[in-house]
Structure formats: C-alpha cells, structure tokens
C-alpha cells in the first residue's frame, strides 16, 4: 500500500501549513495507514512445557490472519501474551488488568477453572469480551454475559455419550473418571439407570503418576468389557499402555474416550489388536481447507524444537489448538463487521467499563463461520456454542487414502468415521449399512483364534495314525471340517484345544458356569466349535452364530429281541377277550335258537308223513342240536339242520353274518401274525419311560439335554427330571460314550441328541431310536458375548449351507456300513413253530373223542343192564351185540354166544384180505351166519324191551 508524504521546508511554516498538517493527521493518515487491533492471551505454563499448545495456536491464528488480508484488509491484528502458573488465580487477575490497561479488544484464556473464573469476573465488570476454549464448570450465576466458549457444552457431550451407549445396546457400562469434573460431564449417562435398563459401575483413576494396573486388573476380573474413560489425552495415552500390558487390548473390549483429542494420539501399537475403540472428533478434516491448515500447522510444529512426550503424533493439531484458532478468527470476523473499533485503556481499580464492549460482544455472538471445528454459532443468552457436530470415529486396521496431506492421510488410515452426532438432531450412524461383502475379512484375516471343543463322535475325534501328531492334526471329524471351511472363507488361523473339564457348559446353583461356556466367558477361547446346543440360559452369557445343524432330543435304547413264535400263535389274531366273547355268543345263540324253535309252531313236524292223522310231532332243534348248529356255522361247516320257521331263520342268518365278519377278520390278521416276527419294545415314547421305573434312564451330566429336563415345566418331563435327579449317580453319565456302553450292557435308556443317535445306530445295529423328537433345537458356534466374529461366522455358515457343503460333511461322517433290514419285504413260509398248535388241537380232539366214546359206552352199558345183573364181561358182549351191527333186522338170533364176538370180527377182517374168489364164497357163508346173528341180537333186544315194558 502506498503512503502519502508531505515535505515541509524550514522557514515556510505558516498558519496554512499548520492547518494542512492537522488535516493530514486527522483525516488522511487514518484512511491510508492500517488500523491496529490488539488482543490479549493469558496462558498457563508448566515446568517441562514453557509454551503450551494454546499459545502456539493463538500465535498461528494471528499470523494466518495478518498474512491473508482478505479477512481484515485495513486492520493489523496484534497480541499481548501473559504466562502464569497453573491454578494461580491472583496472578491471572493481575495479568488481566495489565492487558486491559494496554487497550485489548478481547481476552483469551486461561484454561483452568480457578483462573478462568477470576479473569471472567474482571471482564464481566469492565464489559470486555472474554473468549474461552476449554470445558468450564457451569456457573449458577447467569449474569456473566461478556464471554463465549467454543468448547462444546458438557450437557451436549453427555447426551452424545448416552446416545452411543443406547445405540450399541450396552446393558452394563463402567465409567472411569479422572477427577470430580468427570462426573459432572457425564451426568446424563449417570442418570440413565433410572430411565433405561442400564447398569453403570463408576470407578476413579488413581492420582497422577500412580499405577492404574490394580484398577484394570479388578475390571478384568469383573469382566467389565464396555468402559468409558473421562480423562485428558495425556492420561488416555498412559492408560492405553497399561491396558495393553494387562492383556485387555482384545476384540472383546470396547473403550470409549470422551477426550476430543483421541484421534491425535499415537495408536499404532493398538491398531492390529482387534480392540474396539471409539471417540469423538471435533476437527472437520473432511473439509479440504481445514486439511490444508492442519498440514501447515504440522509443518511448523515439526520444524520447532521437540516437545515433551505427550503421546500425541508429531505435529498433530489438537482440539484445543483448533478451538483457539477458531476463537481468534471469530474475533477477527466480528472486528471486520465493525466499521470503527477504537479500544481505550481500562483500569481495573476504576471500574469504568469499555464503551465499545457490549457492541463488540454482540458482534462476536452474531458471527457465523465454518472453522476448523465445524460451523460455529453461539447462543446469545449464555454464549455457549450451539448446532455443532461431533464426528464419531472408530479405530481400524486399514483404511483408504482419501486426503492429500500426510497428516490427513494418517487420520483416514487409522480412524474411520462411523457417524455424526448433532446437538439438535442427535445421533446419525452413517456406517450402519456398510457393505459387508467387501470388508468381511478385515478383522479376521491372518488372525489366530483359540477354538475350544470336546471329544464327541462324529464331531471331534482323535485322528488314527502310526506317527505322533501335534496341534490341530491330532483331530478330525465334522467340526474340524467345518472349521477348515470357515477358515477358508474368513481367512483366519485357529488353534484347537480340548475343554479341560470335558463338559459342554452348565450353570450350577451358585450361578457359576463350567465347560466350554466358561472358556468363552473367561475369554480363554475365541470360538467354541462343537455340538454345543443353543439354549436360552447360554445365550445370556455367550453369543451364538446361526445353527449349522438342527436336531432334537430322542431316546437311545437297545433293539428289542424278536418274539419267538408259539405253537398257539394262531390264536394271536384275536385277543383272549374276543375268543371268550365268541364262545359266549355261540352258547347264547344256541340257547335262543332252542327256545324259539320250541316256541314257534312251524318247527314241529309229523315224523310219519304217510299218516297225516298221527298226533305225534317232533322238533329237530334239541338243545344239543341247537349247539351243534351254532358250532357248525362258526366253523363254516354244514350241520344238516334246516330252520323252517321265519324266526329261527332270522336267528340263523344273523348268526351266519356274525360268523362271516369274525372269520374274515381272523383270516385277515392271521397272515400278519403268523408271517411277521414281531419286535416288541417295552417303551415306545418318553411317556412310557416316565410311567415306569424298571428301565433306568438319564442324560449326559451338565449338558443341554439335562438342562432341558431340569428347566422344563411340562409335567411328563418334570417327572422324568425328578427320576433322574433322585438317581444322579447312576442316571446321569459323564459323556456319551459312557451312556452308550450302559445302554448296551444294562437295562438303560439314554436321552441324547437325535443326530448323535443317528450316528450311533449306523454303527451299532443293536441300538435304535425310540419314538420321535422331544424338542427342536440347533448346534451353533459359540463366541464370547459381544464378539465381533459372530456375525462373520454366521454369514460364512449361511454360505456353506447354500452351497450344500454342510450336508456333504454330514453325509461324510454319518454314513456307516448300515444295518440289515429289520423286516423282510416278502412274507416268510409258515413253519411248525407258527401253526403247530393246530395239529395239537386236532390230536387233542381225537383223543377227546375216544374218551367220550368210552364214556358213552360205559354210560349206555349201565343204562341197558339186565335185571338179572350179569358179570362185567357178559354186559360188554351184550352191548356189542346190540350196538355193533350192519343193519337192522327182525329175524331171529342164532344165540348170544355167536353175537359178534372177537373171533367173528377177526374172521371178517381175515376174509377181506383173501383173494376174490375165496372172498366171495366165504363171505357168503360167514356173512349169512353173522348177519343172522346180528338180526337175532336185534330181535332179542326188541323182545327184551317189550318184556320190560
């Protein structure tokens, strides 16, 4: 800018010259010379850091404004800096008065609350703008109108933290604070348990320079995985080192830091640990203009002398520096809007306020600017920042090069912006719908996972080999194949370890877990790949992937032996009750037929049809004939008894219809009962087990099957659990192998998963599954609760399912040699063992008829005994003479001695065996004699009857 010059020669000083000089000084010089605006800064210093970062940012901003004349073309910004010790409020007040005496337009700093309150009271009394860039304890007195604070409001940050906790669905949170102000900053979160289902545990860090490892050890023991740290970035850097030392820098922990300088820390050691680390960022590095300023700052800092170790990246601009930079720019913008801004010297002891103070304060509060920390606007009432954004950032392993500067590239590489929190609209997570397919293996690639499992055929078995095997090569089976497929998809490595106690995982009465579930809870394992059932109680303490196999509980029992066919198995088609009812029906029908036949007149007939006037009538349906009619119909044989009356024919027809159905049903069932060897089992379902106590039953101790019966509310299963719990030493087994051996050797039924039963029955034909499935469940891959691997494992399992590999693996390990068919498709031929009883019945009938004939013989002999009581032998001969004859005749007898004696019978038999000629001659001679004898016997019997009559 060119400047006007006036030359005044000596001796020419006149009155006009004086007026010209006065005009130049009053009008020309102010328009042509730049205006100077002075601002003051009060900054604390420490012993090892003579110049703090806020002072450097203050100078950097003033220099940038003076170099870029577009903002203040006619004004030069100057500053006065005063340094004080920490927490020295008296020195801060004295230095503030010194700067006000110099005529500063605004005061910046200090940072700590005790000093800032003293300076703020002076500025408020003299009506000078006070600019703050640090968190300040909220003041109860609202009369402090002459200050603004660019640091986000504590209540807003507290709401942002609470929104994130709710978004992540954390049910248990640990808050670790550095000093008492942390409880004020997080009061919205601390009040959360009263409104939300969140448990909050509050802990305090030890004083400065104290070891925090005991606190971290206690947190690790208590399994506190979600931790919020409220501390400075220096403390955060030290805490992270101790967390790494304690082995708590794993993927199961999620740390959130409230400091806005988390992004500026050197976290290279923790990037590949898998830990979840989240924080806020106020710098708007997405803006190219902001990135360029950060690069300039970084270049200047790298050229400066090295600073003490603070854990920050070299040359990184902190949030404090960015806020101070923006604060200086806000004052510059306000001064640019003021046409004339003349600041006079102020004296603290006079209490005379600045004349331009209120106007300048309003200009600052009304200013709008997109600075390094985003859009800046103020609330005119309290001077606090409003409508601001907080970037939500998360630590990651690899990133994309999106920025041009080295510092910005590093920020994009280490941190990922996953959302934005706005003071008005709240939380907006922009990373919720990210493309998983492109980045699915980021956290698993080349990572070695500890896998816990249990020996269980065919899921995990020792590999058979002549050479010693080590590591994962020791094992084979379904779960090892599944692990291999998951590893191929996700790219991780794994180390398989057997669970020490050999149990799946159950909870005792004290709430303590064992088995593989405990391994996951204690984070001694990353995955549990085994036949681990997904249950409600386990889901509360660990996470599960989607099931890779579905199944249910069933009963393993010995195959029943085939029933040996009995000789009377032909009776099996009808139950004993039916046989009895059939016999009773036969007797009943016979009696009814006898009564009706006697009652109806149409069943009586004349035995002498040639003599129609005869008064003698007869009835064929005697009691014995009626019974014989019923038996003949039942046996499907004729009895030569014909009912004549309609009533008796109705009885006969109904009886025939009854016998038709009975015989048809018997015939239909006879084939099945005689040709098929029946397999009878004492139990057919869980209900059968529950109803008896002879067969002992149980499950694997501390397994999901045992837990199912223990927790079940169904009466049948409650009864079964009562049985098992009363006999725990004998009913519950240690593992499946022990249970299978008991099933084979004793009268024991094992309750286990259907897939395991399927495998066992394929290899042992003496075992079988009884009944259907008691429940329905699935096997899943277990992970510690909150594990980042669960979703990736689930996606990989679904991929294997769609490709059919899960089915192929099951076919590979379940397929056995197979067992022979239990039942032949063709009916077997009947043997003596099937129908031998029929021959026994026939023989018994023949023997019975012989004895009945003898009985009839004896009975008739007694009845027809002569009056003159002959001997036993003569009575026998008499009976034979009267009963055994060829045909009736009334001719005379040849004598008693010749009546069909034993010799006559033998003679007749001998004649029949001779030749034809001799047979005819002799038969005529002997036959005539015998025939005459028979007639004589008959005649004598007739005469005796008449005599007796």
UniProtKB/Swiss-Prot annotation:
GO MF entries: extracellularly glutamate-gated ion channel activity; glutamate binding; glutamate-gated calcium ion channel activity; glutamate-gated receptor activity; identical protein binding; kainate selective glutamate receptor activity; L-glutamate transmembrane transporter activity; ligand-gated monoatomic ion channel activity involved in regulation of presynaptic membrane potential
Endpoints of the signal sequence: 1-30
An annotated GO cellular component: ionotropic glutamate receptor complex
Modified residues (Phosphothreonine): 761
Cysteine-cysteine disulfides: 765-819
UniProt GO BP: adult behavior; behavioral response to pain; chemical synaptic transmission; establishment of localization in cell; excitatory postsynaptic potential; gamma-aminobutyric acid secretion; inhibitory postsynaptic potential; ionotropic glutamate receptor signaling pathway
Residues carrying covalently attached carbohydrate according to the record: 68, 74, 276, 379, 428, 439, 446, 561, 766
Reaction(s) catalysed by this chain's protein: Ca(2+)(in) = Ca(2+)(out)
Effect of residue 636 to R: In RNA edited version
Claim: Disulfide bond is one of the keywords in the record: yes
Alphabetized UniProt keyword annotations: Cell membrane, Disulfide bond, Glycoprotein, Ion channel, Ion transport, Ligand-gated ion channel, Membrane, Phosphoprotein, Postsynaptic cell membrane, Receptor, Signal, Synapse, Transmembrane, Transmembrane helix, Transport
Subcellular location: Cell membrane; Postsynaptic cell membrane
Classification via Gene3D superfamilies: 1.10.287.70, 3.40.50.2300, Periplasmic binding protein-like II (3.40.190.10)
Tissue: Expressed in the olfactory bulb (at protein level). Expressed in subsets of neurons throughout the developing and adult central and peripheral nervous systems. In the CNS principally in the medial amygdaloid nuclei, medial habenulae, pyriform and cingulate cortices, and Purkinje cell layer. Also highly expressed in embryonic and adult dorsal root ganglia. Expressed at high levels in the trigeminal ganglion neurons.
Presence of keyword S-adenosyl-L-methionine: no
Transmembrane intervals: 577-597, 654-674, 835-855
Chain positions with Phosphoserine modification: 725
Extracellular side: 31-576, 675-834
Oligomeric form and interacting partners: Homotetramer or heterotetramer of pore-forming glutamate receptor subunits. Tetramers may be formed by the dimerization of dimers. Can form functional heteromeric receptors with GRIK4 and GRIK5. Interacts with KLHL17.
Protein's job: Ionotropic glutamate receptor that functions as a cation-permeable ligand-gated ion channel, gated by L-glutamate and the glutamatergic agonist kainic acid. L-glutamate acts as an excitatory neurotransmitter at many synapses in the central nervous system. Binding of the excitatory neurotransmitter L-glutamate induces a conformation change, leading to the opening of the cation channel, and thereby converts the chemical signal to an electrical impulse. The receptor then desensitizes rapidly and enters a transient inactive state, characterized by the presence of bound agonist.
The protein, known as: Glutamate receptor ionotropic, kainate 1
Source organism of this protein record: Rattus norvegicus
Lineage: Eukaryota, Metazoa, Chordata, Craniata, Vertebrata
């Amino acid at each position: 800018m060119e400047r006007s010059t006036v030359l005044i020669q000596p001796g020419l000083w006149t009155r006009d010259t004086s007026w010209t000089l006065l005009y130049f000084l009053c009008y020309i010089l102010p328009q042509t010379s730049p205006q100077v605006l002075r601002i003051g800064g009060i900054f604390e210093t420490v012993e090892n850091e003579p110049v703090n970062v806020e002072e450097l940012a203050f100078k950097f901003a003033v220099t940038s404004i003076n170099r870029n004349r577009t903002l203040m073309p006619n004004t030069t910004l100057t500053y006065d800096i005063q340094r004080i010790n920490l927490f020295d409020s008296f020195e801060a007040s004295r230095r503030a008065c010194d700067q006000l005496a110099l005529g500063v337009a605004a005061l910046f700093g200090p940072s700590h609350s005790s000093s800032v309150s003293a300076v703020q009271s002076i500025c408020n009394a003299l009506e000078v703008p006070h600019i703050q860039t640090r968190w300040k304890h909220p003041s109860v007195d609202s009369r402090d109108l002459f200050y603004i604070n660019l640091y986000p409001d504590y209540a807003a940050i507290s709401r942002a933290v609470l929104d994130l906790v709710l978004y992540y669905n954390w049910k248990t949170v640990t808050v670790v604070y550095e000093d008492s102000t942390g409880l004020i900053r997080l009061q919205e979160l601390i009040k959360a348990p009263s409104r939300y289902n969140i448990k909050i545990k509050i802990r305090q860090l030890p004083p400065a320079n104290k070891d925090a490892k005991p606190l971290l050890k206690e947190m690790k023991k208590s399994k506190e995985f979600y931790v919020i740290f409220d501390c400075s970035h220096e403390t955060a850097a030290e805490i992270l080192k101790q967390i790494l030392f304690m082995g708590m820098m794993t993927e199961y922990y999620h740390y959130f830091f409230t400091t806005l300088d988390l992004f500026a820390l050197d976290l290279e050691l923790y990037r590949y640990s898998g830990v979840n680390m989240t924080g806020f960022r106020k710098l708007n590095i997405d803006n190219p203009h902001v990135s360029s300023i950060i690069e300039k700052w970084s270049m200047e800092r790298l050229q400066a002398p090295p600073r003490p170790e603070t854990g920050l990246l070299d040359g990184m601009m902190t949030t404090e520096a960015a806020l101070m930079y923006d604060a200086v720019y806000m004052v510059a913008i306000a001064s640019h809007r003021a046409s004339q801004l003349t600041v006079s010297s102020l004296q603290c002891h006079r209490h005379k306020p600045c004349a331009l103070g209120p106007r300048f304060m309003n200009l600052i509060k009304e200013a709008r600017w997109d600075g390094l920390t985003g859009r800046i606007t103020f609330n005119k009432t309290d001077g606090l920042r409003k409508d601001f954004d907080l970037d939500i950032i998360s630590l990651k392993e690899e990133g994309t090069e999106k920025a041009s500067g080295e510092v910005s590239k590093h920020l994009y590489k280490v941190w990922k912006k996953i959302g934005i929190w706005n003071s008005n609209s709240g939380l907006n997570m922009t990373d919720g719908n990210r493309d998983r397919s492109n980045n699915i293996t980021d956290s698993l690639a080349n990572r070695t996972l500890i896998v816990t499992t249990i020996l269980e055929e065919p899921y995990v078995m020792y590999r058979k080999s002549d050479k010693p095997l080590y590591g994962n090569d020791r094992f084979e089976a379904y779960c090892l194949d599944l692990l291999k497929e998951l590893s191929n998809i996700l790219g991780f490595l794994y180390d398989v370890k057997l669970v020490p106690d050999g149990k799946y995982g159950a909870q005792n009465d004290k709430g303590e877990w064992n088995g593989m579930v405990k391994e996951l809870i204690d984070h001694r394992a990353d995955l549990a790949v085994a036949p681990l059932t997904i249950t409600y109680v386990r889901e509360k303490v660990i996470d599960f992937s989607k099931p890779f196999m579905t199944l249910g509980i069933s009963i393993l029992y010995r195959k029943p032996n085939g029933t040996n066919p009995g000789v009377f198995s032909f009776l099996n088609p009808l139950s004993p009750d039916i046989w009895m009812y059939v016999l009773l029906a036969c007797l009943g029908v016979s009696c009814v037929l006898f009564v009706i036949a006697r009652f109806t007149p149409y069943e009586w007939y004349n035995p002498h049809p040639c003599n129609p006037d005869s008064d003698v009538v007869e009835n064929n349906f005697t009691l014995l004939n009626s019974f014989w009619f019923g038996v003949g119909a039942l046996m499907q044989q004729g009895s030569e008894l014909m009912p004549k009356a309609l009533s008796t024919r109705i009885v006969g027809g109904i009886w025939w219809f009854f016998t038709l159905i009975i015989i048809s049903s018997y015939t239909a069932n006879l084939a099945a009962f005689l040709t098929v060897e029946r397999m009878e089992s004492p139990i057919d379902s869980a209900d059968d087990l529950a109803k008896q106590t002879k067969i002992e039953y149980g499950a694997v101790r501390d397994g999901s099957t045992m837990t199912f019966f223990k927790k079940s509310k169904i009466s049948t299963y409650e009864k079964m659990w009562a049985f098992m719990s009363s006999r725990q030493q004998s009913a519950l087994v240690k593992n499946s192998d022990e249970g299978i051996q008991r099933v084979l050797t004793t009268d024991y039924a094992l309750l286990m998963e259907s897939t395991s039963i399927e495998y066992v029955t394929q290899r042992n034909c003496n075992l079988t599954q009884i009944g259907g499935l008691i429940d329905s469940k699935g096997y899943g891959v277990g992970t510690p609760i909150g594990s980042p691997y669960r979703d990736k494992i689930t996606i990989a399992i679904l991929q294997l399912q769609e490709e059919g590999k899960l089915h192929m693996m099951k076919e590979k390990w379940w397929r056995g040699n197979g067992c022979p068919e239990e039942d032949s498709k063709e009916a077997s031929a009947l043997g003596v063992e099937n129908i031998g009883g029929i021959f026994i019945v026939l023989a018994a009938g023949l023997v019975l008829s012989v004895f009945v004939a003898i009985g009839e013989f004896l009975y008739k002999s007694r009845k027809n005994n002569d009056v003159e009581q002959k001997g036993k032998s003569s009575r026998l001969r008499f009976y034979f003479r009267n009963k055994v004859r060829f045909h009736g005749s009334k001719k005379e007898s040849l004598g008693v001695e010749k009546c069909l004696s034993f010799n006559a019978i033998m003679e007749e038999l001998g004649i029949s065996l001779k030749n034809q000629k001799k047979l005819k001659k002799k038969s005529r001679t002997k036959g005539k004699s015998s025939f005459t004898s028979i007639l004589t016997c008959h005649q004598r019997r007739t005469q005796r009857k008449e005599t007796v009559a």
